[in-house]
Structure formats: C-alpha cells, structure tokens
C-alpha cells in the first residue's frame, strides 16, 4: 500500500483494520484534493474556483437509514427517536466495509470536533472521494501540522458512497446506511454521496458524550457583539441560522453546531455549510463571496454550461443546494471559535401559517416549552411530496435527528443555563406575514434584522409589550424604524376571521405535539403552553 502525507506512523490505517488498499493519502490540503477530485471526474470547477459536485439520488440526509448499536452502553439512548441494530449486525457491516475498501484509493483526514481543547473529540475520517475529504477538512477543525505526527483518534468515520448495505445481513432498511457504534466510537457511512452525513455524524457523537461532561450540545448558530455579548440562534434548516448570524457588526462564532459549557460557548466546527438556493450578493454578501472562491465546495449547484458561473436560483437538482467553506472566509469570523456565556437565546421559526409575531419575548418556562417543541413549517418545494398547504414540523430541541439522548436531558440543561446566566430569550418568526404561505409574503429580512438588533443591544427592554392572546408570550407594540402593524400579525391579514381560525389551529398543533413531554416537565412549563381555551374565546 502506497501512503502519502503527514501522519502518525505508529497509529495508521491498520489500527482500524484497513488493509490491502491501493493508496492512502493523509491530510492533503485543498490544492491536492482539487487535483485528485478533478482528475477522477468527481467534480467540476466554477468560474471563480469553487469545487462543484453532484450527490445523485441523495441530496440531503436520510434519517430513516441511520442506525445505532444497541448494547449495555447505550441503554440511556432515546430509542423513541433512534433506530437500533445489534452488535453482531454492526460487526458484519464493519467487516464488509473493510473488505469493500480493499484495492481502493482512500483519503484520510485527522481533525477535531470542538474548538474547546477540554471537550473536543479527535476524529479520523477515511473517505473514498477526494471532494468528501476536502468537505470534512473544511467543516471540522484542522490541527496544527506538528500535532498530526502524534494524532490518535477517539472517533473514526469511514465514508464510502459506492458501498451497498444488505438489509437482511446488516439489519438496516436499504442499501444506504449510516451506522454508529458508540462503544467502539466508529461511524460507517455507505450508499450516499451527500457529504452532510459526515458532519452530522460527528454532531450526533458529541450530542451523546458531552452532556455527561457538563456541556450542552446545540443545533444553533452563534455570534458575539463588541461588548462580549454572545447570542445563540436555534432553528431548523431554512429558518435563518446562517443568514442571521452573519452580521457585519458582530463576530461570527459559527453557523450550525455549538457547545455551551463551564467557560462559555464554543463552535464544534471550523467551517460553514450554508443553504444557497437563491443566494445573492445583495441579500447575503458574505456568504455569496465565500461561496465563489477557491476552497469552497458547492453541492448540487447548477453551473452555466459555458461560463461555469453558478446559478444559485436554479433548484432543478434540489432545493437543498449547499455551500461549504472555511469559517475564515467570513471576514468577521472568530479565530478561536469561542465566546463568553450567552446574553441572548433566539429561537427561529419559519412560520408558514403567518400567525406568529416577528418577535416575542419568552419567559424561562416558555423558552423550555418552545425549545422542546422545536417548531417551524415546511412549504412546497422544500421537500418531496408536500402539497400547497404548509405542513408544521416539530423537531424537538431544534435537532431531533441528531439527539441520541432523551430530549429532556437537553431541555433541562438549557433551562439551568438560562437561569444561571440570566439570559434573555426570544422567539423570532422568519416565515410569513399578511397571510399564510400562498397568500401572504415572506417576513422582510430588514425587519427581522432590525428587531434582532434591538433585542441584542438591549433596546427592546425599554419598549411596551402586550401579551399575545393565543400564545401567551410578550410582544412589543412599537419600535422605532419598524412598521407597528407588522408587530401584531392580525393587523397584516385582510381576513381577520381567517387569521383567528388559523391561529387557533396552530395552537392546537402545538398542544398535540407537546403531549408527549407533559409528564417530563415541571408545572410552570406545562402552564407556558399556548392556551386553546383562551384562543377559542
């Protein structure tokens, strides 16, 4: 086996069982990975030098194909939200991965998951594709070159899209598979070319290990103001985590995954993974610039045949087009990936029913209620099979697919942290106003940014609030520079009766979803629920 690159010779691929490989390239940088990727026909170049790859059948994660080994060490797993396989099935899968790798050229990256040295996890990723190696090198945190000589991984991932699982032999659903063995700290990914599976496997692993060490893992973006006032933004895909945290007046910590521990907030990653459908220089100049340069990786973005300029408006391959780029491509990004304890927690919801206010102040009990609810709404075009009506999505802790432990573990941690650090909590609707999807319009991003700025700089503490009659939270009645009618959603609807009907329907959806948590939360959290009786008056 021919090996190239800087590595720990005393702890190589043989420690993982890999043998009889054709070649193994260790810790290559972007120029070399570009070269291998283009030579193999894996990807093409954009006009400005981004590496562009298609992921074929899978243009997003496949949560139904994700499995975890069930054994004595994982009895604390949240099995209601996770699928299991036996240790024997995983071992058969592992052996078949090892056999499948024989004779192939693989790429290895030694990386850190986590910017805090106390809590980071040393991660080794073997990939079949050069562009996947560049992707994960971009998304995780790269060690100093001198650290590679002695690097010993705690977590090992092997990612081979050409592998096909056998459902009968391996105990899985299809030929596509993501399998995690927490006891052995191994992740096996096969069948999918979608690179995001790798990064989310690291996130899932950190979600499993960190709570026991006093760190709350979070599916959120984070930034910090000039006075050291950190803000975190929870939200599901498409709600604005990446967009709203990229603020030229604040330092970006990260756009997707963070831990909140004894010394503050830290990024799990060293890169960003932005949705880039309809990306424009005018609306998101920082992300646009980062996506149009050497070192960026574009997934499923259509290029003009002649000019090779990306057409970010073209969703013909998928609405889930993506751009991966190093965090330092954002001019005001943190170089440490760390920040003080948050002063503000923001929960983002893209409410396609158009009844949530653009911003609301949450009590600590309401914050836990909305965190466990994890609400947003999907509309046609974001996923296959959606009709013309909005579909509510409740993804607990704003990250249900990545939670190995019971949601109450994360909810209780958040509540304690909010209390310990006297954090202000906000719910922000980045969805629709003036009617639901199809009738109303998208909440203007200028309005959202103005309200967020007022929340983060303390201006909203000095305004008058009303209590929302449907949801019970506090809503500002006026704010300089923001049209007052937009602050109360009913004023933006022509049909007030239809608004009332829609608002009460959404309240009912919240209540129905939260029923499964009622036995696990305190009375004040149950009391923080939207009140159907009040809403029905």
Swiss-Prot record:
Lineage: superkingdom: Bacteria
Binding-site positions, Mn(2+): 200, 219, 256
SUPFAM superfamilies: PEP carboxykinase N-terminal domain, PEP carboxykinase-like
Keyword terms of this UniProt record: ATP-binding, Cytoplasm, Decarboxylase, Gluconeogenesis, Lyase, Manganese, Metal-binding, Nucleotide-binding
Binding site for substrate: 61, 194, 200, 322
Biological processes annotated in GO: gluconeogenesis
Cofactor(s) the record lists: Mn(2+)
A GO CC term assigned to this protein in UniProt: cytosol
Record-given protein name: Phosphoenolpyruvate carboxykinase (ATP)
Phylogenetic placement of the source organism: Bacteria, Pseudomonadati, Pseudomonadota, Alphaproteobacteria, Hyphomicrobiales
Gene that encodes it: pckA
């Amino acid at each position: 086996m021919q090996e190239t690159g800087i590595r720990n010779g005393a702890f190589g691929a043989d420690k993982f069982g890999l043998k009889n490989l054709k070649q193994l390239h260790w810790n290559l940088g972007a120029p070399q990975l570009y070269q291998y990727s283009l030579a193999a026909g894996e990807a093409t170049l954009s006009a400005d030098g981004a590496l562009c790859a298609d992921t074929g059948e899978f243009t997003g994660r496949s949560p139904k194909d994700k499995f975890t080994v069930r054994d004595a060490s994982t009895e604390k797993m949240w099995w209601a939200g996770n699928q299991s396989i036996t240790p024997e099935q995983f071992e058969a899968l592992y052996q078949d991965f090892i056999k499948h790798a024989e004779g192939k050229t693989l790429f290895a990256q030694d990386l850190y998951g986590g910017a805090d040295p106390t809590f980071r996890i040393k991660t080794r990723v073997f990939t079949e594709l050069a562009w996947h190696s560049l992707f994960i090198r971009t998304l995780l945190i790269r060690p100093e070159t001198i650290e590679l000589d002695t690097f010993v991984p705690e977590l090992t991932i092997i990612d081979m899209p050409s592998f096909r699982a056998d459902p009968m032999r391996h105990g899985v659903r299809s030929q596509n598979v993501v399998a995690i063995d927490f006891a052995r700290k191994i992740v096996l990914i096969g069948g999918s070319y979608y690179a995001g599976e790798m990064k989310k496997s690291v996130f899932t692993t950190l979600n499993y290990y960190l709570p026991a060490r006093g760190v709350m893992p979070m599916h959120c973006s984070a930034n910090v103001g000039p006075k050291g006032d950190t803000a975190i933004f929870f939200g599901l895909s498409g709600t604005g985590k990446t967009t709203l945290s990229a603020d030229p007046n604040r330092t970006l910590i990260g756009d997707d995954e963070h831990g909140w521990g004894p010394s503050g907030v830290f990024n799990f990653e060293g890169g960003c993974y932005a949705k880039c459908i309809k990306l424009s220089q005018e609306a998101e100049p920082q992300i646009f610039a980062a996506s149009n340069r050497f070192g960026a990786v574009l997934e499923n973005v259509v290029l003009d045949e002649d000019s090779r300029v990306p057409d970010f408006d073209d969703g013909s391959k998928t609405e889930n087009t993506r751009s991966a780029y190093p965090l330092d491509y954002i001019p005001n990004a943190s170089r440490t990936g760390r920040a003080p304890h948050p002063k503000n927690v923001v929960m983002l919801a893209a409410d396609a029913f158009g009844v949530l206010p653009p911003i609301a102040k949450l009590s600590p009990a309401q914050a836990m209620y909305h965190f466990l609810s994890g609400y947003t709404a999907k509309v046609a075009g974001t996923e296959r099979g959606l009709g013309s009506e909005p579909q509510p999505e409740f993804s607990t802790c704003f990250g249900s697919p990545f939670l190995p432990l019971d949601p109450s573990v994360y909810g209780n941690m958040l509540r304690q942290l909010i209390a310990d650090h006297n954090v202000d909590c906000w719910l922000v609707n980045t969805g629709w106003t003036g009617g639901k999807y199809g009738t109303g319009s998208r909440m203007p991003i200028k309005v959202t940014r103005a309200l967020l700025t007022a929340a983060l700089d303390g201006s909203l503490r000095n305004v008058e609030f009303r209590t929302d009659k449907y949801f019970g939270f506090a809503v500002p009645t006026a704010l300089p520079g923001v049209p007052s009618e937009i602050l109360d959603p009913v004023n933006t609807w022509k049909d007030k009766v239809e608004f009332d009907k829609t608002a009460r329907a959404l309240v009912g959806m919240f209540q129905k979803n939260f029923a499964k948590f009622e036995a696990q939360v305190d009375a004040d959290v149950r009391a923080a629920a939207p009140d159907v009786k009040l809403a029905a008056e």
